[in-house]
Amino acid sequence: MKNEKGWLSLGGKTCYNGGREQERGNAKMPQIIEITDLSRPELDVFCRLTEAQLRNRLEPEKGVFIAESPTVIGLALDAGYEPLALLTERKFIEGKAAGIIARCGEIPLYTGEREVLARLTGYELTRGVLCAMRRPRPKDFREVCAGTRRVAVLENVVDSTNVGAIIRSAAALGIDAVLLTPSCCDPLNRRAVRVSMGTVFQIPWAYIGEQPAEWPSPGLDWLNGLGFKTAAMALREDSVSIGDEGLAAEPKLAIVLGTEGTGLTARTIADCDYTVRIPMQHGVDSLNVAAASAVAFWQLRAK
């Protein structure tokens, strides 16, 4: 929040935005702040805070995440997410970042030359603009599952690239919602948001349970109680092919995908209603979880 003196709280830190804003027509515009000191504490949100610090588990109402590129930031704004501060190369203010800047209103806009921002962030801002945004209130998985027919469940998927790719495939290929066990990577991790291309703001998602001990039991029981049959994606001798007609005919199906490398736990596989395999050729024994998810989502989508 910004008070009358222009101070802004970002992830628990207090930042100064100059106490004034510019106006373009009747619209209030961000106060442009030239970066001359890379150690300014208000820049920590963009470069020095860890993902855990941004998330702020102890005070989730103060949590922040970073969105990159005009496309991704625009999707977040479309979904109602609150912008807190912008960081962009000076030349983009009237270029690729102009539309986003106009939408964000009176928030701090930090800017500098490419070399300055590269030293600050550790990489070039090839996507033009970063936006620090307020994390939303966590949703209950029951709320997310209301009225759905197909949901994806990620078990202990810790790689941010995979989480982002799975969410993107889910949004594109007919999945209604994504659920994550408590040990999964945060979907609002910077890389996960980037890889998802903003689809994390378009498809509902939630954690199923608050503690790792709540999965697979009672987590799977909760899904069954909501009317879902559960399908564990795993290569087992007793598995059914992903093309099984009975599987596709299920009115409500939860597609359960396991962590990188080891896949689903034996207990999860045993407790699911189905064990499902993707037939392979040329001696290939498995697919990356993100690739497997895309195949499963398309084949098992509600018809």
Write out the residue ranges for each language-model feature.
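Active-site/ligand-binding-proximal alpha/beta "capping" segment
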Residues: 231-284
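Structured adenosyl-cofactor binding patch, chiefly the S-adenosyl-L-methionine
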Residues: 131, 171-173, 187-201, 266-303
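RNA substrate-binding interface of SAM-dependent RNA methyltransferases
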Residues: 30, 109-111, 136-238
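Short, aromatic/basic amphipathic alpha-helical patches
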Residues: 95-106, 268
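A glycine-rich helix N-cap at a beta->alpha junction
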Residues: 105-122
